[in-house]
Structures are given as C-alpha cells and as structure tokens.
Regions:
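Nucleotide/phosphate-binding catalytic cleft detector across ATP-hydrolyzing
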Residues: 1-73, 81-183
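Conserved Rossmann-like nucleotide-cofactor binding loop
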Residues: 76
C-alpha cells in the first residue's frame, strides 16, 4: 500500500526498500517480509532489526565496542536490545506498547476525574505532557483536555499535567522496565 501510495499509478522507477523488523523474527519470517515487499513493487528489499534502526535514529554509535541498551516502544510491543559492534548482542520484547499506554491514560482519567476521553486525547496527553517519571511542580507540563462528564454526560474541559500521565502509565512502564532488566 505504502509503495503504491508513494509512487502513484505511474511507475518510473521501483524503489529499494529498507524494512525494520523485530530482532527476534525467524529466517522464514524475514524471507516472507522480503517477498511481500518485492511483490508490493519494490526493486529490492533489505531487513534491519528495529532496535538497530532505533539506535541509528537516536545517533547512538552502534559500531563502537561499547554496549548500548535500546528500548524501542512501538504501538503494540516494546523491544529491548543491547547493541555493540553494529549488531544485536541480546534482545527481548514485551507486548506493551503505545496503544496500551493510551488505554491506561484513558482509564486513569475516567476513574480519577470521572471524565470520559477518547484514545486520540489520551495519545495527545502522552505526547504533549507525558513523562515516565514524576516531576516537581516547576518541571511538569500541563494541557487542557475535553471529554464527557461521566455523571451528567455533558461536555467538560479540565487541565491535566505530566504527573497524571506518569501515574496512569506507571504499571505498564514497570512491565517494560522489568523486561529490560532481564537482558
């Protein structure tokens, strides 16, 4: 879909495509990804492990002899890896990602403030004022959110802050942290 969307109907050239995949996929799954990418219109397809791609994106010197831990929180899973000398030394993953964080925020706001918000608002809170650590009053960020009052059913606006997000996602973040410690 993405290749067709990018190139349109007129194909002057076929692109070479780099596909990021989880570090732990099998060789059969790797072949399937390459074949599907070529079938979608790519001239060639290359595989890069997601933690390596994340490390490159974060300007981590992956070729050095020093070990670097990368935690890549995706939509559905979080992948942790130790990278050294350009490769993955050790990796693991857990089925906790951004989507679960959004749902945790949504539930927290509903339970604590009796305000029903949507997933888009929860994600916006995570992106704009989110923090994995509790912040002091001088450091925390705030934003206004709109939702539906859980009692009256009427629209309501309220201000939330970084510590609301931290409290909401603390359980999920603990799961990610405990998994990372296993490497």
């Amino acid at each position: 879909y993405f290749i067709n969307k990018t190139l349109g109907k007129v194909r002057i050239f076929r692109p070479e495509v780099m596909v990021a995949v989880p570090a732990g996929i099998s060789s059969t799954e790797r072949r399937a990804v390459i074949e599907a990418t070529i079938a979608a219109g790519a001239k060639a397809a290359y595989i890069i492990k997601e933690p390596v791609a994340a490390a490159i994106g974060a300007n981590i010197p992956i070729s050095s002899a020093t070990g670097h831990m990368v935690v890549d929180i995706g939509g559905g899973t979080s992948e942790m890896a130790v990278i050294s000398l350009g490769g993955v030394v050790s990796s693991t993953s857990v089925r906790v990602g951004g989507n679960k964080l959004d749902l945790a925020i949504l539930e927290y706001i509903r339970k604590k403030y009796n305000l029903v918000i949507g997933e888009r608002t929860a994600e916006e809170m995570k992106m704009k004022v989110g923090s994995a650590l509790f912040l002091d009053d001088d450091s925390k960020l705030t934003m206004e959110i709109n939702g539906r009052d859980g009692v009256s059913g009427l629209p309501r606006t309220m201000e939330v802050n970084s510590n609301d997000v931290t409290a909401a996602i603390s359980g999920e973040m603990e799961t990610i942290l405990n998994t990372a410690k296993k490497i």
